[in-house]
């Protein structure tokens, strides 16, 4: 998952 992003 991208750092600092929600896990959608």
Swiss-Prot record:
| Keyword vocabulary terms for this entry | Amidation, Neuropeptide, Secreted
Q: Which domain of life is it from?
A: Eukaryota
Quote the subcellular location field of this record: Secreted
Coiled-coil annotated spans: none
Question: One GO CC term of this entry?
Answer: extracellular region
Annotated positions of the Phenylalanine amide modification: 8
Leader peptide range in chain numbering = none
Biological process per Gene Ontology, one example term: neuropeptide signaling pathway
The function of this protein is: Neuropeptide.
Protein's name in the database: Long neuropeptide F
